[in-house]
Amino acid sequence: MDNNNNNVFNNNSDICQQLLQRYSKSSAPQHHHLCAIAAATRSIIQSESLPITPFSYFAVTISTISNSQDSLDPQELSGVSSFLAIVLPLVNQEDVSLDKVVEAIGVLVGILEKGLLESEGVLGTSTVRAFVKCLGILVGFCDKEDWDSVKVGFEILVKFSIDKRPKVRKCAHDCIVCLFKSFGSTAVAKKAGKRIYSLIKENTALALKLSALKEISGSKDEHQEVLHSLNILKPIIPYLTVKDNEKVLAQLVELMSSQSSAFTRHIFDNIGTILDSSGVEIILPEADQIIKALVSYMSSAENPADNVLFAANLAKGIIDKLHDGGMSVWVTYLPLVVGSISGLLTRPENIALPASNILKELINGHIDGKKFLTAKKQTVDDEALSGSEFEAVKAICLVFENMLLSSSEYPNDHILAILSVMFLKLGEVLDFCEKGIILKLADWMIVASGGAYDTKNLQECIGSAVVAMGPEKLLALLPISLNTKDYSLSNSWLIPVLNKYVCGSSLGFFLKHVVPLAVSFEQTSSKVKKSVIREELQAYARGCWGLLPAFCHCPSDVHKKAEALTTLLIPFLKEDSFMLEYISAALQELVNKNKNVLASDNLSEELIVHQTENENLDLALEFKRRCSYSKKSASKNIKALASCSEEWLQALVNVFFESSPAKYQQFKEAIECLTSITDSSLTQRIFTSSMERAGITNDIGEYRKLGPHSTDNKENNSTLLEEVAKRCMILELGSCFIEGSNEDLIEVLFGIARDVLEASHGAGHHEAYHILSKILEKHSWFRSSHLEQLMGLFASVKPPTDTKSLTSRFACYKTLLIDAIQGNMDEENTEAFLILNEIILALKDSTEEGRKTAYDALIGVCSSLRDSSSAKSDESYKKFVDMIIAYLSGSSPHIKSGAVSALSVLVYSDANICLSVPDLVPSVLTLLQSKDVEVTKAVLGFVKVFVSSIQAKDLHNLLSDIVNGVLPWSSVSRHHFKSKVCHGHRGDLDEEVWSCRS
């Protein structure tokens, strides 16, 4: 019978009555017996005029057991024990005197001891468990400073904690744990701890004896007792005294020497618990033996995977404990533990992956290359390199080096990942201890380059070395050199690795070492007769030149080498030069990185775009850390770059005029970033010169307007198109000058764009709208001072039909519309409605491209308003939605349906809009009463979008309005209304209706 049911009884009402109510209808004999015992006990209580309380039931029951225990048969004892197990938890400790507690303990101990002595089966499991439970409660009632009152009962609980019956044993375990929790730091706690230690000591001796016999199967009961004692130990370790834990740990270490696999996990569990709950002073004396035993255990391939990994974690925990406790001995054990766990990296995946994670935690927690640098962290500290910590690092490196050298197999991903972590943690001291590893990895890279292996992870591993030690040291170890006899190139595989992972190097190194290498390849290629070899050498040369952008990832000497770099590279700026793309990327890297630092309040939030594809988070973060400047350094760098920017700009503008439009994109962004740091007067002078060069200025150097051109004949039309083409080219160039332009130059650019829009019928409109959109985006003063002119201009020019021009026109509208809404919250803005009107009408465009452009414009406005940092962003967003809703009351069905389509777009992108603007859905649904086909189609489309986008709980309040509005159209067969309602909405509505019902 289950005795764990006291939680369903309470001490505020008669227990007998509670039992009768619960079990009177039960057909189980034990329930009848229990009710009979309760009734008999109540009769005794009443006959003696005692109160009907749990204590009275307890006192009478104990008295009955004491007086009749010799005459009670097992079945009767079972019933009495069950009843007592129900009653006793309901008794308040204050109600029971200590004398009565001791007396009751004596009664129960007598029964339980008798059960231990008699043959198995006299007392059933449930009976023993019930009495053990009661004994545990009674011992808890004893005086916590009087061991004599506790000793007898506690001793019996300890004996039953290794009982062969699981339920009895579990009950005894629970009682002992509860008692230790209640003992606290009392005198009784110390005595109880000693008793547990003696139990462990006895069973340690037994385990060693069994191990010596090497026939555990022949001593099964004794073997089980050892396991049970280890099981009871784990939960009470946190409550033992420091001294007891020291002695227990010593016993566990001795038990480890038994080499019995049956005890291993239990021993590990208990050592782990001691590790977690104790100070380093307990671990230190036994650390050496434990570490060596764990290392020995991990080295055996026959041991279970779970236990091996537990041992690895345990060894790591000991290292952590010693390290955190300030015990220098951790340095001695670290290589031993790392070496042992590293052997698991070649095991099956279920072992290798967790082992890899454990090693990463060990390395990240205990190896730091910065410790071996001087205070300024610029040079290696020779004294630190001779210390014990660095000796440990070298020993660990030797472990991995030997692993690579002793194996003929390609290193797996786990080994490479660990090496990556090691490289990054060692940083600038990497070349003092990992040269052998890097050389071996290079050998594998040469082998793998033939296509035998996937080199992605190997390249990433070597990339970590590049990030850690820098390309200068790596190339000193693995030089890229040309064999002049057979023209073979050593370590050519390094070029793409450097291209991806160089950061924080120096332009000086690139100029002094990489450039001469590229030049030598070019010179040698010109002397080679065989075309295949010549092309290979040229490719190597390009590869070296292609490292330019990589060496511009946060170089340390921009302020010193900007001029030298300019002198070297400007001659390469020609239209057909392969260097054009490299130079453009390098300039953007140099300028934008430093600009971002100056503009950013939080450097850690900067993104390194070229590194986002890296899956190794540690590597990416380290790359990011190294690729950063202080604001002071960035300011010096920008100043140096600005001093050369005029020369760069002029050279790039020359390339612009020599190139075809198809190649503009290669260098436009470089021009744009340079103009942003160049003095605006210089920028204006260069642009004015470009206008003259394009032939669009008059005799005094001012812009020459197109003027009236007749397009009646081919000759006049051709002349106009030629003039427009010149202005388009200048507008294309001008779009790169926007950020660094002063107001005068912006006015010039606006004049050219306006001239093109007014004078031509579509030609050049894309370029004109594009530059206007950039001006509006970058210069707020222009938006406020030229609003009327712009609106007049846009009104006078027919909306374009080509997608590019329309997209750029709507980009202008987006900026103006957002500005108008946010700037005039309390007023109606005519310009805003004019803009919105055109976008809404475009939603009804006959072409899919035109409609999509309008959709994108609407979503862009919504996103900007919604995500704005302005305190009134919510208010602005709602105002925009209200403006669209206002069109629903318009007179034109075309504009009404367009407005409904616009709202469909907004709901599709953000269904919550229906909740933040409560009038939205009802306003649309009222249009279902309209007789106009176009409007009805749009509303039915809106309903479909709305129903499929919103949550069922939010749909509930609107469901009846939707159903009442939509269903009447299900009977209209014209214009496909019936099919739209029945097929287009039925599934969505059915699903939502059932969701709302549920």
Give the residues covered by each predicted segment:
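Extended, low-complexity, acidic/polar intrinsically disordered regions
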Residues: 1-998
